[in-house]
Amino acid sequence: MPIEVESPEQLGYDTITNNLSESSVADRRLVDLGLDVDLDALVLCYGDHLGDPALRAAIAASAGTDTVDAEHVLVTPGAATALFLVATSQLEPGDHVVVVRSNYATNLETPRAIGAELECHDLSFEDGWRLDVDALCARIRPGATKLVSITTPHNPTGTVVAPADVARIATAAGDAGAVLLVDETYRDLTHDGAPPPLAAALGEHVVSVSSMSKAYGLPGIRTGWAVCTGEALAEQLLAAKEQVVISGSIIDEHLAAGVLARRDEVLPPIVADVRARLAIVDEWMAGQSTFEWVRPDGGVVGLVRFGPDVAVDDAAFHRVLLADHGTYVGPGHWFEQSDRCFRLGFGWPTHEELRAGLAALEAAAAQAQLP
């Protein structure tokens, strides 16, 4: 998967000055979290297979609905593991899967590796990256479709599926006997209004996935979760987890529980900063004749593309952007898109690096323009 091979972690952070490829807020130091934790007192045993009870209670408390309890939460080593567990526990070769594309690579590659029949519902710039719910639901085959996968807010476009539309998809999936997987990793980072309730509240066949990585800037504590109110489905996910990792890291889950216990203090300044960063990009885009995008509704990423009348060597653009300007973005092929598109991450760099990176985009585009 190129998104992993070409990730900034593998490329080397020391080769990048302005990192606009990241899909999370800035990484945080343990000392900055203000946690009152005594790591020396932790017993480094196998933990609760479902996850730390205090962490599960905190996740349930943030669900925005009374339908979700701590017993419905399965903690996993990152959201990627949760996505993997859903696919591997629910799919067999030949099973029909409907996936909204672009999507996180795990949601595409794992069903492919299993040998499932993957049907992609592609979003388009011309439609504002908006999900056509009727068209998506028309792809669901009663008795044949086993899994439907959506993301909201969406990565890499930042568009949001309205709660009423998520409910419609949940109904269609349930009527067909399919599981609905909703990746809600950016749920806490909406740009207008409060986050919606977890989609898992919509039915026992719905799984919500999220993590500490994107909104909290804590990818180093590998902590994600899957939320499901259906007992049978939840048991399948737990069994899959036990086969792969048994339980999570005692240290990681303890730290995550401490952060989520202070969620009401931790999140507001993060959300305010994300909106300030979006304003920087808004101002830059307002003066653009080279690039265009659909303004994201949530998250810290947007999918930018060259305007249709801009003649450019996109391979040269990405090459000189890094080599000459020290700036890195997520090229379109990470998301099975043309490299005339790229994911712009505005949540991770400093404000100064963000502004410098935006200027670098213009400079690199000028260098790569075709006659």
For the regions a protein language model found, what residue spans apply to each?
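A short helix->loop->beta-strand "cap" motif at the edges of active sites that frequently abuts
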Residues: 95, 116, 175-178, 204
